[in-house]
A protein has these predicted regions:
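Single, function-defining residue in the core of a domain
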Residues: 1-58, 91, 99-102, 117-121, ...
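A short, well-structured juxtamembrane/interface segment
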Residues: 105-112, 174-175
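Short alpha-helical linear motifs
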Residues: 82-86, 107-110, 368-374
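Catalytic micro-motifs at enzyme active sites that drive phosphoryl/nucleotidyl and oxygen chemistry
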Residues: 72, 111-112, 139-142, 178
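A short structural micro-motif
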Residues: 66, 105-106, 306
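Major-groove recognition helix of helix-turn-helix-like DNA-binding domains
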Residues: 73-93
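DNA-recognition alpha helix
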Residues: 55-73
Length: 387
């Protein structure tokens, strides 16, 4: 007879319920609620994420199939499709947003991995657009016949988890999200070409942080000093000021412009940074690691349920995205705390077919020989946590 709790119930133990309850109280999330609380809602959504449910109906069918186990799964009472839909439509998404922020902080504390041996953190900031059907998601109008939202993410490269998430309509330009970033003195911030906003970059400079942005090809710098002996692959390395009035007004300080050539295909990359002393090799290494935020977007869109939404209102969509991020951070925490040597992709595949099994988590990952999982795993897919 199996004495171990269900796998999903063991995962729930990694969540800080007291913190969640305090957030719920702050927003009066359970006011006038008799049975199906915000906690029950969170666990239902996470069960759907981990079990790869494609729709609200699909999730409810799965819950009904395990109706006799829900109490021992820690989910509580069963819920109807209409009640879950109502909860996602009406309950304040900020409850889940704030708890996602808490889970991000918890995951980051555990997953410090000094790749660059710097005093400050190293972040990549980028966005991904999630397309929505305009006829269903009328509030998310993007173009004439298209809807969508943007997920702006500040990604902690060394901890390999998001540090900050900001959701906007898809028609908001990437650089408009830059003022929302919680900047830290001494940190490095890496951007792609969509973030050539020199006023915001000057904000980073003023607080004593560093930026590295891939510049547009027409950027003009008046050189004051330049390096004559350049390492292989570095075409140019100069320090100067902007020559264009608008740019110089937004960023009046000196900055550095590097042109680095990719030895494999000859592509030239133009970078701007306020780090005037770092080696060109270090700058190049920083930008190469920016790709990890792209892998995060690819991973979360492929393996967590944010492509197919279980509600049509903006509130419901936000709740689902934040529950996806909470789930992502939970798996990252479990992987760290249990010292698992599997990638998060493998962990999710195993969990997806084992949530209602009764075995200890450590035994599940130690004893399982999921060759079919590895066979299905495409090595070209992002594998963020496979150390």
């Amino acid at each position: 007879m199996h004495k171990d709790p269900y796998i999903f119930a063991q995962l729930v133990k990694f969540l800080d319920r007291s913190k969640f309850n305090r957030i719920v109280t702050k927003y009066e999330g359970d006011k006038y609620i008799k049975s199906y609380t915000c906690w029950n809602q969170l666990l239902t959504m996470m069960f759907g994420q981990l079990s790869n449910r494609d729709s609200l109906r699909d999730l409810i069918v799965a819950m009904e199939a395990h109706a006799g186990k829900l109490y021992h799964l820690e989910i509580g009472k069963s819920v109807t499709r209409s009640n879950l839909s109502k909860a996602n439509e009406q309950r304040n998404y900020r409850i889940f947003e704030e708890y996602a922020t808490f889970m991000i902080a918890e995951a980051r504390k555990r997953r410090i991995n000094k790749i660059f041996e710097l005093d400050g953190h190293v972040y990549a900031f980028d966005s991904t657009t999630i397309d929505l059907c305009l006829s269903v998601f009328e509030w998310a109008k993007f173009r004439k016949h298209k809807g969508g939202i943007k997920l702006h993410t500040l990604y902690d490269i060394e901890a390999e988890v998001p540090a900050f998430v900001h959701i906007t309509p898809a028609n908001i330009h990437d650089s408009k999200a830059m003022p929302e970033i919680p900047y830290e003195s001494g940190a490095h911030y890496i951007f792609d070409r969509g973030y050539n906003d020199f006023s915001n970059l000057n904000t980073i400079n003023r607080i004593g942080a560093f930026f590295l942005v891939r510049a547009k090809t027409n950027v003009r710098i008046k050189p004051k000093t330049w390096k004559r002996r350049l390492p292989e692959g570095v075409v140019s390395d100069v320090i100067g000021c902007f020559t264009v009035y608008k740019s110089s007004k937004d960023y009046p300080e000196e900055l550095r412009k590097l042109i680095i050539e990719n030895p494999e295909d000859g592509t030239r990359y133009i970078f701007l940074t306020n780090n005037l002393d770092a080696s060109a090799e270090f700058i190049s290494s920083l930008y190469r690691n920016r790709w990890s935020v792209e892998l995060f977007f690819k991973w979360i869109k492929q393996h967590l349920r944010i492509k197919k939404f279980w509600g049509t209102s903006e509130n419901a969509v936000r709740i689902q995205i934040y529950c996806a991020i909470i789930t992502y951070c939970l798996v990252a925490i479990v992987q760290h705390d249990m010292k698992l040597e599997r990638s998060v992709y493998e962990i999710l595949q195993i969990l997806g077919i084992s949530l209602t099994d009764k075995t200890h988590l450590s035994d599940l990952f130690d004893k399982s020989n999921f060759k079919n999982v590895k066979d299905r795993y495409d090595s070209s897919e992002p594998n963020l946590f496979n150390f």
